[in-house]
Each structure stands twice: as C-alpha cells, then as structure tokens.
Amino acid sequence: KTYNVAFVSSTNTTVNIPATVADPNNQYTFNVTAIANNSTVPNATSVTMPNTIVRIEANAFKDGNITSITIPQSVKEIQSGAFGQMSYLTAINVDAANPNFRSDNGVLIEKKDSKEWVAAYPLARPDVEYTVPEGVYGVYTNAFQRASYLTKITLPASLKESPSTAEFNGYTSAQNLREIAVAAGNTAFKSVDGVLLSADGKKLIAYPNGKAGSPSTNPAYQGVTGQPNASVYKVPDGVESIEQAAFAQVNGLTAIELNGVKKLAKGAFDKAVKLRNVLLGPSVDTIEDGAFGGNNDLAAFDVDPANPNYAADNGVIYTKNKEELVLFPAGKAGEYTTLPTTKKIRNRAFYYAQKVTKVTFNSNLEIIDNDAFQATTKLANITFEAPAKIKTIGTFAFQGSGLTELNIPASLEVVSWSAFGSTKLKKVTVADGSQLQSINTGAFNGCKDLEEFTFEGSSTLNKIQADAFSGDDKLKSFVIPEKVTVLERGAFNGASGLETITFKQPATMTVIGEGAFQYAKALKRIELPSTVTTISKDAFNTCSS
C-alpha cells in the first residue's frame, strides 16, 4: 500500500527530504508530497526537496539559517506566507521545467490562469528597491511579508490586482517600506506620495509600513511620556474608502486625518500599534466590523458631532441611535459600562483591547457578536445587569480573554463555537431557568484553569457539542442536565482531572459520541441512564482509572 505524507521536521544541518519513506517493517510506502504548515528545520543551512512535492504550506522551514531554496518541477501549490518565517532567505529559485512558477532574480512568481502574480519575496534579499516585472498581473496577499530591507516597490503598468484580507495586504509587515510607486500607463492604480490608491483616487489600497507622517505641534496630537512624537497622515482629497488592511501593522503613524473618507473597511487599521489619534468626520457613513483593532496607544475615538451615522461615548464608537457598540479603542484602560440603549456589540468591537479589565453589560443587550472580545487578555470580569436579555454570544467572542469567572444569565440561548475557548475561567455558573439550547463546538475548549461548571436549576440544554470541554484538565465533576440527549464527539476529551459525571434525573441521554470522555484519566465510575442507546467508539478510551 502507498500513502502520501508531509515533511514536518529535521534537526540536520543539510536537509535532504526523501521522495519516499517506509515503515520499520517495510509493509507500507509513503510518498512525501507536501511540506507541512509550520515545519521546522532549526539547524539547517540548506534544504533539498524531491520531485514528489506538490504542495508547500504556510510557514514552511521555520527557524533555520537557509539562504536559498529551489522549488522542484512537481510543485503545484505554494500557500500564502509559505516562506514568511525563513529569516535568512535571499533567493527563491525554481526548476526551469516547473509549469506553475518561475523566479524573477530570486523573487517567486506564480503562473495562474495565464496570468502572473508576485507570490513571495525573500525576507533577507538585500536590495532596497524592487521593480515588479512588466507583464505581472497581481501581487498576492503577504507577497512582501517581512521583507527586511525593501524601501521602495515599483508596480508595472500591467498590474491590475492587489488583494487583501482583513489583516494583511500584499505589503504588510515590510517594516522599512516607505514608497509604493506605480509605472506610467497603469489603469488600475496610482501612487500619491508613495501611497497606493486606485486609479480614480477613490480607494486607498495600501500605506507603506515604514512611511512616516508629517510632524505636528498640534497639542491634541502630542502623546504622553514614552510615546513617539506626533506623526500625522492626512488622507488625500477625493479618497472615499480606506480598504481592507490598508494601514495594517503600519508603525510610523500616530494620527490619521480622514478628510472626506466615507468608508472604513474591515481591518483597515489592524494593529497599527502607534496610532493614538483618530477623528471621524461627518462624511463617514460606513465602519465595517473590526476596522480598528490592536491599536494599543489609541485610548479614545473622536467623532464629529455632525456625523449622522455614528457618535462617541467616552471615546467609544456607537451607531447614532446608540443601539450598537461599533468600536472600543484598544488603548482604553480600566472598566467600562455599555450604554443603557445598547442591543448589540459588533464583531471585533473590543478585538485585542488588552487594557480593559472589566465590562458591565446593560440589561437590554441581546447580542455579543463574533470575535467581539477576542484576545482581551486583561479582561477578568464581565457582568450582565439584571434583568438580562442577552440571547447570543458569537463565535470566538471571548476566546483568549482573561476571564476568570462567568455567570451566564437565564436568557442566553446560544454559546457559539469556541466562544470562551482558551480563557482563564475557573468557575462558570448557569442561572436557574436557563434557555441555553446547546453548548456549541469548543465553547469552553482549552480552559486549563476551569474547576467548576454548575447549573443552578432548570435548564433547556439538549446538546453538548464536539470538544465543548476538551482539554479542561482541572474540571473534576460535571452534572449533565436532564434534557441533554446528545454528547458529541470529544465533548470532554482530555479532561484528565474529571472524576465524576452525573446525569440529572430524569435523564434523557441517548447518544454518547466518539471519544466523548477519551483521556478522562481520573474518571473512576459512571452510571449511564437507561435511555442511552448509542455509545460510539473510543467514548471511554484511555480512562485509566
């Protein structure tokens, strides 16, 4: 039998990846067809790939000292950021017979659907300027990721596409880049003072990461001790939209004057860490979810009172009717209480707000959207004012936050996928009369400090989904409410400290899913209700006690 496998790691200085490997008994042959995501070569000075490799995944060949690499003829796919952790890489070469890729003097170009794209620029290539060859159609997201020495990129007249995500554009994290120039005759883009705009001047596409703004003596722009001097950028006249990730990770600006901008796209200013002054003028009519995030010096937003769409409360942006909390400044410290009129906290509203410590939610709040409080590492406490009306907590809403205790109101109906995953929770209490229907996939996954999860009274809960409590190794006991009929795959997988499981009577449990209690090593005894009809494979695998 033959199987396909991926290269994962080697500690050799010279790494020669084999085309095939066999198991110790020579019963099976494995073709090496991929370089795995986050593959490591900590001691390597060179690596040779066989002509069986068809895919190179993101962050390949991490941690080594490799200066050049050759892509074999067989490679068909190279993921975004594939070489983004190869800090010493100066050249990406390509076998001349490869039909999908070529090298432009060490810069990787992909051939796709009869068009060419800049795919990856070597991080340590010593040139300070690079001119994209004429004929190239586009620049991929992360193409110039972490380019150490580049100060100027010139785009050809042929270039028509420069896509981005909510966190990255094609030039993000090229920290010394100060100018993106555009050749004459380009009908898709133009450059204004080194900043990439659409040809009509209505969209700001990308601001070079290392480009400084203009100095200012305006008292409003001056920082506190330890912060850099004011560096201000005024968006050019005519620009109506700041596109996705246009200022992502930009490190040379402290203030933005939006001028006549109407739209701020998702991630427009993501992790622009030195930004501390933002004024939203009356023209701004659209702020997409997570337009700002991770701006650690930004303590308050200013919104022009004449803006008909948005308003600020103590530096926090709301919709004009005060029903939706749009953005919380990531540098705002301490405690915060949402306005009494608030019904929804938007996607990524508090994203990477790492100075907020406590949030009190008004009783009328109904929805906390996806990623709303993700990575709020100092947020230790949240409180829902009574009578709480909260119904939905979205996907990854508090993932990676600093929460230590949680009281879930009876009104809550949905706890979404990984909503509280990887938090510091120690205790969770669900109120009597709970309307919670399901604890969704991974909702409390990886809560390594979780010791207690309690339902105070009646509950409508009918399902505990896959991996809901997986890896919660300090959880010692759990009482499953009587209306729960299904424990899905791996619900308590890896809850190694779990000693007792109790089914509240009259129990209605019918299905215990695959690996539901796998690696619950401390579980000594469980009394299953008579209603159970299905126990899937590995449900109690490695319950060694």
Please provide the spans of the model-predicted regions:
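N-terminal-proximal low-complexity accessory segments that begin disordered
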Residues: 2-3
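Structural signature of tandem-repeat unit edges
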Residues: 10-33, 42-55, 64-77, 87-107, ...
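Consensus positions within tandem repeat domains that build extended binding/scaffold surfaces
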Residues: 58-60, 80-82, 141-143, 243-246, ...
